[in-house]
Amino acid sequence: MKRSTGGTQPKGLNVKRSKLADARFIEVESPALSNGAVDLKKFIESRSFEITALQDAMKRSKESSAQRAFQALPRCLRRRAASHNIKRIPKGLRDRALYEMQLSSSSTLPIAPSRQRLKRFIKRLRRKLAKSGETKAIDSTGSLVTDNSTDDSRIPSLAAVKLIRGKFAGRQLRKVWLPTHLWVCKRAHMINAWGYAIPEKPTEKSYRPTHRAAFRKDAIAFDMSYEPLFCISGPYEALKEKFGNSFANGLPPVFLNSSRSFTSYLVKSDIHELICPCFLQWNNPTEDDKKQIPVKNPTECVQLVIRLHPSAFLQAWNYLSGIAVLDDRIAMHDWRLDLASFDIHGPDSNIMLHKVFDDVELDEAGKVWQSISNYSSACLPMGASISVKALVNTRCDKNLSEKGEKSLLDSAENSLPASANQYSTHFRYWERQEIPSFAVFENKNRHTHEKKSSEKEVIPVYITYRKEWNGLTVILPWDYAKFVWRKMMYQKGIRFGGLENLHQIAFEKRMPFFPIDYPDTISGQLCEEERKKRNEDSWKRRPPAKRVNYQKFGDNFSEIGNPFCCDWVYLNEMVKASRDEDKTLQLVRVQVQLVQRGSLQDRARIYCLSDDELSKWKTIIYKENLTAENLLYPKCPNETAIIGFVTTGNFNLNAGKPSGIANVLAKTIKNEKSGYCIIRNVGCSVPRLAQWKFNQSH
């Protein structure tokens, strides 16, 4: 029923516009001139009237706005469900929100303090304190099953979960909270994976903002503390001899004698099985740390620091420890839950990180760190690593926008290099021929760091540039990570992301994302099983009339293999049934991109093309310019032509067209670096011509 309008109020879309125009109308008076002469009395009255009219128009314009205080907030701070609670609004807008609540006709009133409520709270608190003294501490949290633990702690056994005491200890018995959990869990969707509570994606819309932060301007930060850190200690010659074949590119000495990190693939050299990609860094421990390493001749030891994906950690640890246990010169150290790590991606990641670590000790590394404060991330040398001692505020109630106490920096020494010669001089820091030493890998406990005051402590921080991500990786002690993260999130121009956002950035950079795009690994197979179950459950929850019938769609077309996953089992059986001599399922990761318009989705089927079929497709596309509805549009090849699946497919905002990461049979592409194929989405009978490209760097 329409709402009746009283009087002769105009109808249409211009009602609101006319009201706003009337509210902003300012009345004026005549110049008060008589025969060219100024009448002083009338002139003052006219100007007084105009000033009053201006003030009245400003007031009416302000009151005519339909925007409330909570609506004036940026999207990331809006709490529409709790807009009646002024405590959910920043302090600068609370007075305005309280005033609007009092003027409104609703019965919502600000909550008045209650003495009875306070008494009940104190009583409950006393009961909890009395009960906490009677509870027993948790003695053990179990251990992971490892194959090669030794009694002399050279190869230690692994703890399943870090021992936690406190208010939320019961929630962390079967999973580990990241150091930023209390901040992130209010702002992101959380998932339990690989024994950790990990943010999946922010609660606000983040697909396009993630693209802008990672590729256009600003930066995006990820808490990567769930990726385990551990190291292998021993003489370099022993490590190169035992583990040289376990990494795809070996252990070249060029990275040993320079402050640079590098990435590689961990493989089982005896059976040529890929385990996972990994991040590597050489470290020269101090003499005191060398004495504590339980190996023969500890003074000759160097450390190979490794960071990899948590889904492959146990497999990698068992494989590497199986090699290390045979040589008493080699030891392994588990640094999980002792060291936290952040990844900051984007063109301004270096500038943002300098705003966080703006107060460092001015040793040689500290001066180099300050000299590159205004450089873009792309200007840094590939794999450049540096260790600084930063002053961290450990008080959460301080205003992080203020400088606080006097900085450790001298303003004269904190200036940027004035010439290109000074620029190159500072960058020679990463060309020195010596084994680097990083303090963060030595003192990992919180109470061993120097205290400058009751609020600030000096902690070691490791920072390295990752060229493939165009960002920086930060490693720091676990207990200080929450303070650094909080300061980082209060910087203008930086946002946080979750697992889905990290996958999106890798996809737009056309990089395979582990473990989703690695079906030839054990972790990738387990991940595909989880995705299959999730897709099938989502399909079953939909009503029959609203879900795709994979048994019959299009022109009597039925889906090939399991429609809820990339069915590698089906492809493997098809390879075994073929007449080829090589009946092994060897996969190669390639990039795919549609030639024409269309959509590209996960689990899409890839078909090979003969030369005759390719010429027919090119004739139709480039000459006749026909659409998919045309009768001359080629039909989809039969099931024997399937050569792979698209593991990640979507619209690529960086490329401006649909693209994807796919895995195809190695024998079908031979030695070619690019070619054409046919791609068909799951539940769709229309094929699309696509171009694949082999990327050797990934």
From Swiss-Prot:
Catalytic activity, EC: 3.1.26.5
Domain of life: Eukaryota
GO biological process: endonucleolytic cleavage in ITS1 to separate SSU-rRNA from 5.8S rRNA and LSU-rRNA from tricistronic rRNA transcript (SSU-rRNA, 5.8S rRNA, LSU-rRNA); tRNA 5'-leader removal; tRNA processing
Enzyme type, top EC level: hydrolase
Gene Ontology cellular component list: nucleolar ribonuclease P complex; nucleolus; nucleus; ribonuclease MRP complex; ribonuclease P complex
Subcellular location: Nucleus, Nucleolus
Record flagged with keyword Transferase: no
InterPro entries associated with the record: Pop1, POP1_C, Pop1_N, POPLD_dom
SUPFAM superfamilies: Folate-binding domain
Keywords assigned by UniProt, alphabetized: Hydrolase, Nucleus, rRNA processing, tRNA processing
KW Chaperone (keyword) present: no
Catalytic activities: Endonucleolytic cleavage of RNA, removing 5'-extranucleotides from tRNA precursor
GO molecular function: ribonuclease P activity; tRNA binding
Complexes and interactors: Component of nuclear RNase P and RNase MRP complexes.
Family per record: Belongs to the POP1 family.
Chain's role: Required for processing of 5.8S rRNA (short form) at site A3 and for 5' and 3' processing of pre-tRNA.
Protein name: Ribonucleases P/MRP protein subunit pop1
Name of the gene this protein is made from: pop1
